[in-house]
Structures are given as structure tokens and as C-alpha cells.
Amino acid sequence: MKSLYSATSNEAAKNANVSQAEFEKRYQESIENPDEFWGREGKRIDWFKPYTKVKNTSFKRGEVSIKWFEDGELNVAYNCIDRHLAKSANKVAYYCEGDKESDEKVAITYQTLHDEVGRLANLLKRQGVKKGDRVAIYMPMIPQAVYAMLACARIGAIHSVIFGGFSAHAIADRLNDCEVKLVITADEGRRAGNTIPLKHNVDMALDNNACPTVENVIVYRYTEKDVPWFEGRDLDWAVEVENESTECPAERMNAEDPLFILYTSGSTGKPKGVVHTTGGYLVYASLTHELVFDLKPDDVYWCAADVGWITGHSYMVYGPLANGTTSILFEGVPTYPDSGRIGRVVDKFDVTILYTAPTAIRALMAKGDEATRSSKRDSLRVLGSVGEPINPEAWSWYYSEIGNSSCPIVDTWWQTETGGMMMTPRIVQGDVKPGSCTGPLYGVQPALVDAQGVLQEEQGVLVEGGLVITDSWPGQARTVYGDHERFEQTYFSTFDGMYFTGDGASRDADGHYWITGRMDDVLNVSGHRLGTAEIESALVAHPSVAEAAIVGFPHDIKGQGIYVYVSAIAGVIPDEELTKSLKLFVRQEIGPIATPDLIQWTSKGLPKTRSGKIMRRILRKIAANEHDQLGDTSTLADPSVVDDLIENRLNV
């Protein structure tokens, strides 16, 4: 595909920190001599005890072990706050933009960040939270969410941030899996003019001692909603920290001590608690944030992600703060009160870098010039995309309308498990192709394999396959909490000696990579990964459902929508009310983000092989309205089931 613009003639590229030639030289070194390359890059952050070992990793089946800088000691909160204070105490760390445009403009300096984190860290210690204890954070997109993460990091507690859209049931699952000692939440959150009952959801999750390891709940009174209070368990944030000191010593952490657990959907139904550790993660988040966005000291950077997802962790909190950046913390959504909001926020704070998801871009694009007519956006110099592949139409609109045809787009590919960006075009490349994540960053060795694990190494032609990474990088997840066997089984058992991403991809004749979608049973809805098994488990728990199967289908706004095939139990006649009830049931069990878009009731059941396996490939084709491309159906136990599904399909 011909590029839409030549990045090398772009103003941002002319002033780039790292030229393309220099990048290629450093990349080669990172592959050929990783110890020397990362040994040097590791010094971008401060260490209490310098490391002498750099890379000690194995992808060998049954022996998977990932260690970086393993004898070094440091503290993440110290690196994100304290080391900046001598020169930048009064620099703004976050400009906070509330859900309502009329909300007061709030600026949080690095000194304020230090003081608030110190107070909360001391409160956590007073409540008996120690190094290695797990703390869950279920908060709105407000500064206190960041304070909570950094307070945990300061004392060596392991935080697990739970997305504010998850239900009580989903919260309880996560609290129990990692045996959380303390929960930090707020009375309510705000989103698009509505309130989110955060404290209520936590109370429901803890009801009847459902999470026995939880001892206390710290509640930030944000909206001042009158919420139920459990004496002896619940603590008022503001009251409790009032007399705490702003000084809290930073715990010395080994580079391989866990920093956080973040749950990501798996194909088995039970969410995986992905563990990221301290040293390698911070080095990688800091480096990739600076490199990809070509960071300058006076940039105002806006990552429009939620703190409950990995993008919020790496590129709204840890990467930017480690680099001493000024960021935007946005509570709202891009389309509230109208689709011009995102541009007005850019103008209000003179944002120079915008990092958002294709879902948001498509939602704005659908509104036409409403998204751009109330703003100029002339402060922008770099645009970024994250969460899912961006289709060329949305890419072109983002470039021409939001970026005024003057900003390079870094279309990044990475995952919760990778910790940071892995592949992206660079702003100094001249042959940018809309929709392509192009090529790897330092230390990343991508490859394509066929079903037998044979590397597809042919160059100069289009090749397709499963996307694997053939060697380790510092930001890589180390394990699944409490289940290293699952970690190995999920990521390293499919192809021995390689990390399997679960994504399919192609590499074109120019060597550029294109992500084609998930190869496992995980959906990517609005840039958020949802396990089909988890949703299916919720559906079959409904008293009227006998069997259910979930697939994704192309959705103009979300990228992928959720298409549900359901069989009712005997005696139940499906109708519109039951369909509504089922959608509500899923919302309550998992959260609004998992709400099905389309529910098709099946009168003849689901298509299965003679061995009883559901043929999801067929369900995907029908949901995508590609029923004329079903392929081989010879193993179907009852072909008439497929005819019935096609005749009654909903996505027409």
C-alpha cells in the first residue's frame, strides 16, 4: 500500500531525538549484544544497588524463566517522583480534566504527588500492609488512583488495579485469586454524566465474607454519595491520611520483586493474573515512552486510556512519571458531552502528544466535523494508536482531521503480557502504511510461524502465520500469579522456545508487519480483551440458558462486537424480554463492557463435530455474514444446525 505521507519530511521527524540510521544501529546492537545494550539502557533509572547481571532468560519448554537486572535494587515510586524533585518539584505531573467540562482545572505537581503518595503509603503501613502484600485498587480516573498505585510501589506492596467497569462478581474473582489484603476504592465514579457505584460493587463483592483475606477497605469520598459503612473494615481516606507524614521511606526492592498483577482474559474462563516485576518493567516502559513518542522536556502528553488496563499502567503512570513528563489525566469519555471534547481538551492544555484507541477514533469519525469544528488542535505534533489494529479509513481520518495532516501516527502493537510497546512505525520512517504496526523496537525479535511452528522466513513476499517473539525483552511478564504452569502452557507450549502472542499476523514484501487478529478464544472489544469462556460461563449460569457460544464480529465502532449464540432450556420460549434479561445478566456478572451486542437463539442447538466439539469457526463466519465461506463442514454431526443458524442470523 502506498504511504499517505512521507514522515521524513515532517517537522516532527526533522527534530527527532533518534534518527532512523541511529535507531537501526541501536536495534542491531540490542539483538546482537543485549547485555551491553540493556546494561547501558538500564541506567536511565536510578538504582539503590547497581546491577551486575543483565539478561538471564529461557523460553525452553518446562524451564521458562525470565530475569533482568536480577541483582539490582531500586524503588519504582522513588524513580517516578523523588529523583525529579531537586530540579522539577513544581513541574506539573498531571493536569486533571474531570468528566464535566465545567469541572475545576486541577494541576498536580511532582511535589504534590510526593506528599500525597507519602501520606497514603504511611496509612497502608499503619494498616499492616507489608512488602509483598496484595492491594486491590478499584478507582475512578482521578489523581487518587495514581496515588494508590505509587503508594503501593513505595512500600513494596503489589497492586492489582481492577477496571472500574467490572461487576461485583468479577471483582470478587480477582480479589480471591491473588488473596488481596486491602482494597482502595471511592464512593462513586463519574463517566459521561453518569455515576458508577464503586463502593457498592466492592461491598457486594465482599458480602457474606466472600473474600476472606480482605481486612480493610479505604474509601475516597469523591462524589460525597451517602454509602453504607462497615465499622472496623471501612476507612475514610481523607480522615485517615490527615495526620500522616508526607515522608515515607522508599522500600528497597529487588529488580525481580513483583510490582503489580493485572488480570487479563484467558481462553479457559478464569482471568489470568499477569505479574510484572520492578526493574525490567520500569526500564522498558521509560525507554519505549521516550523513544516512540520522541519525548521532549516541555511536552504535554495525553494517554486517553483507563488506569485499569495495561496502557494506563505503562503509558499513563509509570513510563511518563519515570521520564518526568507532564500528562493529562482524563476522567471522561471522548464523546461526552459531544464528540468535540477530545479536541477541546487538546486546546485547553496545549497537548502535544495524543495516544488513544481506534475505537475512540471511529466513534469521533462517525460524527463528522462535530469532532473537529470546536477546536484547532494545532499544538499536536505526534499521534498514537493503541489497543487493536486501526483500519486504514480511521487512520486516514485521524491523520487528516485530528492531526491536521501534520502529525505522524505511531500505530503501536503490544499486549498486557509484553509490558510495553513492541512494534510501531517510527516518526522518522518515510514509508508509513496505514494499519501496519511496521516493525520492532529495541530488543524485540518478531517472527511468523506456521501451524507446525516452522518459521516463515521468506523475504520479499507476503507471508502469514502466528506471531511469535523469539527472545526475551525487559518489560516481559514473568508469570501468572500462583500458576507458573499456566504461564508456560499459555505462552510457551504452542511453539517451543518462542513466546506465542496469540495473534495472527502477516509480513508484507517490504518486511512490514500487519496484525490480523486473535488466534485464540479472546475478543478485542473497544481495545479491551475479553475471554469468551468467561462470558459463556456467565450466560450458562442464567436459569433459562442450556448452552452458549460467543464469537466476535466486525463492529464499526468497537472493532469487534460480541455475538452470542444461545440454546434455551426445555420449556423456555425465547422472546425480546428474555433477550434483554440475558444482556442485563451478563452486565451484572462481568460488567457493561461484556454486554452482548447480538443474541441469536438457536432452535436446533450449536454446530458440533461428532466428538461434541463446538465448531466456532463456523459461528464466526455466520456472525461476520460470511456464511458462503464456511469451508469444510464434513465433520459436523448435524449439518441442518448450520442451515438454521444462517437462516436466522442477526448481522445482516
Swiss-Prot record:
Q: Which reaction does it catalyse?
A: acetate + ATP + CoA = acetyl-CoA + AMP + diphosphate
What does UniProt give as the signal peptide span?
none
Q: Which annotated residues bind ATP?
A: 387-389, 411-416, 503, 518, 529
| Binding residue positions for Mg(2+) | 540, 542, 545
A Gene Ontology molecular-function term? AMP binding
Give all N6-acetyllysine modified positions.
Answer: 613
Query: What Gene Ontology cellular-component terms does the record carry?
Result: cytosol
Keywords from the UniProt entry: Acetylation, ATP-binding, Ligase, Magnesium, Metal-binding, Nucleotide-binding
Write out the function statement from the record: Catalyzes the conversion of acetate into acetyl-CoA (AcCoA), an essential intermediate at the junction of anabolic and catabolic pathways. AcsA undergoes a two-step reaction. In the first half reaction, AcsA combines acetate with ATP to form acetyl-adenylate (AcAMP) intermediate. In the second half reaction, it can then transfer the acetyl group from AcAMP to the sulfhydryl group of CoA, forming the product AcCoA.
- Family of this protein: Belongs to the ATP-dependent AMP-binding enzyme family.
Output this protein's name.
Acetyl-coenzyme A synthetase
Q: Which organism is it from?
A: Marinomonas sp. (strain MWYL1)
Question: What gene makes this protein?
Answer: acsA
